[in-house]
From Swiss-Prot:
Transmembrane segments: none annotated. InterPro entries: Anthracycline_SecMetBiosynth (IPR052164), Glyas_Bleomycin-R_OHBP_Dase (IPR029068), Glyoxy/Ble-like_N (IPR053863), VOC (IPR037523). Residues 6-125 form the VOC domain. Glyoxylase-like domain-containing protein; part of the gene cluster that mediates the biosynthesis of the selective antifungal agent ascochitine, an o-quinone methide that plays a possible protective role against other microbial competitors in nature and is considered to be important for pathogenicity of legume-associated Didymella species. The pathway probably begins with the synthesis of a keto-aldehyde intermediate by the ascochitine non-reducing polyketide synthase pksAC from successive condensations of 4 malonyl-CoA units, presumably with a simple acetyl-CoA starter unit. Keywords: Virulence. Gene3D superfamilies: 2,3-Dihydroxybiphenyl 1,2-Dioxygenase, domain 1. It holds the Pfam family Ble-like_N. Pathway: Mycotoxin biosynthesis. The keyword Cytoplasm does not apply. This is Glyoxylase-like domain-containing protein. The keyword Secreted does not apply. It comes from the Eukaryota.
Length: 128
């Protein structure tokens, strides 16, 4: 059942779609493929699914000429911040911050750039 207000999907801008797909696949285990309709090549767009069925539709990595200067950030749950930030840098991303802790009611998180320069964060939820 789709819930009112639930995120339907996300689109990640990329100047190199295949590089971005490889980054997210190698770092987070997301599964990528060319669009099912066969009319758009994988170098221009790839759809993906992420663990946990976080949105009912697929996510999309789409080719752009230039990454927008600002936009939405998404926070990705991970089991281990240290191991994941190491995977981010190993796979071509960039660590932007140390771990940020805002108190007991906010999970620790850390910002990074993907291979395309998009800013996102990883977070961990101990005990969940």
């Amino acid at each position: 059942m789709v819930l009112h207000g639930q995120i339907s999907g996300i689109e990640i801008p990329a100047t190199d779609v295949e590089r971005a797909a490889k980054f997210y696949s190698d770092t987070f285990g997301w599964k990528f493929q060319a669009p099912a309709n066969g009319t758009i090549p994988a170098s221009k767009m790839q759809t993906f699914t992420a663990p946990g069925d976080i949105f009912p539709d697929e996510g999309v990595v789409s080719k752009v000429e230039e990454i927008p200067k600002s936009g939405a950030k998404f926070y990705i749950n991970v089991d281990d911040l240290k191991a994941t930030i190491e995977a981010v840098t190993k796979n071509g991303g960039k660590q932007l911050s140390d771990v940020i802790s805002l108190g007991p009611h906010v999970p620790p998180f850390q910002f990074f750039h993907d291979t395309e320069g998009n800013t996102h964060a990883i977070c961990t939820r101990p005990g969940k």
